[in-house]
Structures are given as structure tokens and as C-alpha cells.
Amino acid sequence: MHNEPTCHPNRRNIIASAAGFLAAALVSEIKAEGGVDYFPAIDTHTHFYDPTRPQGIPWPGKGDSVLYRKVMPDEFQKLTAPYNVQSTIIVEASAWVEDNQWLLDLAKGDKFIAGIVGRLDPADKEFSAHWKRFAKNPLYVGIRVNHSDLQKGLEDKSYLENIRMIASDQRQLDVNGGPATPVEVAKLAKLIPDLRIVINHEANLVIDGKDVPKDWLEAMQLAASNKNVFCKVSALAEGTRKTMGDAPKDLEFYKPVLDSLWNVFGEDRLIFGSNWPVSVRAATYATIHRIVHTYFSSKGKIAAEKYFMKNAIAAYKPPTRG
């Protein structure tokens, strides 16, 4: 049996927790080699798993020479300490229901973990029971769904009722999918305006250094017209579709995408995330962080502080960990 809190946090407690988290996390900026000041950050997109456990893992597969190994928070914490990463929000990639609990157990004794974005299927008849079980834990900040499932779910009353359960518990929804994803996100945002929604990975746009596609931009504008929609600037290097650690390192290559996101979402609804360890296929953490640090620093200290931490707290409302 797992020991879990027995009550759902209410709105007042969640707001207080978010405020407390920010107060606890905002520490002095770190000055790294070269005299660069790094803003306190929450990396809102990481994956952890252990293929050596008895039951194994459903993802990544054994044939993945890069990712198929034990990947745990202590490694990530050491890697990112020079960049002032204060904590992380883990996104569950496994489709196994019990892996939601595995991550909550992992987080229980590790204050570096700010929250868990779980994986449950709102189309599942058992969703309500699973949700109530995991959401008792305040570290369970929401779930992630795929665009294709959301597209079908928008026509399903029971699916939408389950999504409303997430909103009523003051949790959030990550949505992952291709460039058409923001269209369905916009529809959902209008249907459930009190649900905080986070688009993952810039809607997985192919990043080629050129002007962004009109369809993607218009879809993002449609989603961003709803104030409850955020966009995670994550998997940026993977967007280049490079897989040998050879993604471009020059900020200018990514500027058309970053400028478009900035113009569409502004300083209050863009969120920092790396997609580590998947990101190592395309680039080092140092490269990924430098690109976004350089870009958002150019927007001023207030905007950079929002991007690296404050917007994550607004979207995910992680509990204070004393």
C-alpha cells in the first residue's frame, strides 16, 4: 500500500502553496564561468525511468542506445546545478497506470522534484478512480494527453467530463502533438475556461531556421487568444530533427520560432522546459540552456524570471516543499 494524503488541496491552499514555492525558490542568481548570470529555473519537462527494476519499462525500448539506461533525478540535478535549475516537473511518458505512482514515490523523498505531470487516459472508464487516487497527492499537478486523443475526445461527453474533473481540482493539462495541436487546444480552452492548458514543444514544429509556417502561426494565435493557454518552449533542439547531437547552436537559427512565440504569447505564458534526456539526441543541456537564456535575457530581467520560473508556477502551481 502507498501512503497518500487523504484530501484534495483546495483553491486557497494551492494559491498559498504556489506563493510559498516562489518565495522559497527565488535565490540569488548564479554566476557561472564567463560571468553569466543564470536565473532561477524550474525545468518543466524531464523524464525519469529505471529499466533495471523488476517490471522493466515500456519506454524507451531496449533498442534505443541513447535513452535505454537508468535515468534518475540525481543525475539531472548535478547536470543542471551550474545553470541554477532549482527543481523539475516530471512528465510521465509511460502508459502504465502504476508508473504514475512510481513517480510519486520517487518524488516523495526528493525535494528537487516540484511536481508530476501524470499519464492517464480521459477516455478510460476507470479514469475517475485513477484520477482521484493520484490527485490526492498535491505533487500530482496534472496529466498529459496526446493531440489525436484530444481531437476525438472533444466529441465525447464523458471525456470532457473527466477533463472538467481536472479543472475542478485546480490541476492542469499538458497537450502534446503536431502543428495542428493548438486548434484543438483552443476549442478545449473555450469549453473549459478554468482549465490551465500547456502546449508541449511548440506543437512540435519542424525548426529549419526559416520563417515559421503560416498555418502553425495562425493555430498558435488561436490558442493564445485564450488566457488559460500556455506554451512550453521545450524540445527546441529536437525541432531541428537532428539526432546526432548536431543541432545548430546559434540563437539566430531559432529566432524565427522564438520571436513568433514571444509575439503570440507574450512574457506571461511562455515556459522553460528541456525534454531531457531525450534532448541529448539533438544537443547538450548547455547548448539548449544558452539559446533560451540568451534570448529571454534580451527581453529584460522581469521577462526572463517569468520564463524560467514564475510562469511555470502560474501554470502548474506546484506545492511548497518544506
Spans of model-derived segments:
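Active-site metal-binding loops of divalent metal-dependent hydrolases
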Residues: 46, 93, 202, 275-276
